[in-house]
Amino acid sequence: MTIGVLGLQGDFREHLWALQKLQVETIVVKTVEDLRKTKGLIIPGGESTTIGKLARLTGIADELEKLVDQDFPIYGTCAGMILLAKQIVNYPYQYSFGFMDIVVERNAYGRQVESFEVNLDIPSTGGLFKAIFIRAPKIVEWGEGVEVLARYGDSPVLVRQGNLLASSFHPELGQDLRIHKYFLEMAGVKHAGIC
């Protein structure tokens, strides 16, 4: 079973590396045809406005809308989380897919030079996880159907809603593959047990 990584812009190569290390068949998704070959999709960090525009231009956004109705698994990191959100408070006119019942604030954890790493307690992945935050979005509201898997302070930074997963941080930039494994298990994709 193939997992796609949206390759329109952003750090998609790092996600490919993580999936390949887990011995999962992967494809870079740049077209609707690419997307149709997958059993799940990762939307990487990058520039959410650019990724959103390109997803609409290529038809990928429309195709994702159909797939989400069929419980298609999607994981969004950083910019990917912004695109999954139903609303972006500090950029109300920015396009998002709106699949998750979360409201986010872009760049809420600071600018690029204010990036940081922190250990998060994530029981569903086996405890402490070193999370890397780079111009990260903050979840400021979330619906009842959204499960909070990890928090930084009082704010959720890893959430799940059905077959949708989103994180403010970048697990693809570290060596710990447990978040990717969690997503693969959500998607029903077998992987190597490497951490």
Swiss-Prot record:
Q: Which reaction does it catalyse?
A: aldehydo-D-ribose 5-phosphate + D-glyceraldehyde 3-phosphate + L-glutamine = pyridoxal 5'-phosphate + L-glutamate + phosphate + 3 H2O + H(+); L-glutamine + H2O = L-glutamate + NH4(+)
Q: What's in the keyword line of the UniProt record?
A: Glutamine amidotransferase, Hydrolase, Lyase, Pyridoxal phosphate
Task: Please indicate if the UniProt record lists Hydrolase as a keyword.
Answer: yes
Positions with a binding annotation for L-glutamine: G46, E47, S48, R106, I134, R135
Q: Does the keyword Transferase apply?
A: no
Tell me which residues this entry annotates as catalytic: C78, H170, E172
Domain of life, per the record?
A: Bacteria
Pfam families per the UniProt record, alphabetical: SNO
Q: Which Gene3D superfamilies match?
A: 3.40.50.880
One Gene Ontology term, aspect cellular component: cytosol
Q: Name one GO biological process term.
A: pyridoxal phosphate biosynthetic process
Kindly tell me the pathway this chain contributes to: Cofactor biosynthesis; pyridoxal 5'-phosphate biosynthesis
- Membership in a protein family: Belongs to the glutaminase PdxT/SNO family.
Its function? Answer: Catalyzes the hydrolysis of glutamine to glutamate and ammonia as part of the biosynthesis of pyridoxal 5'-phosphate. The resulting ammonia molecule is channeled to the active site of PdxS.
Put simply, this protein is called: Pyridoxal 5'-phosphate synthase subunit PdxT
Q: Which organism is it from?
A: Pseudothermotoga lettingae (strain ATCC BAA-301 / DSM 14385 / NBRC 107922 / TMO) (Thermotoga lettingae)
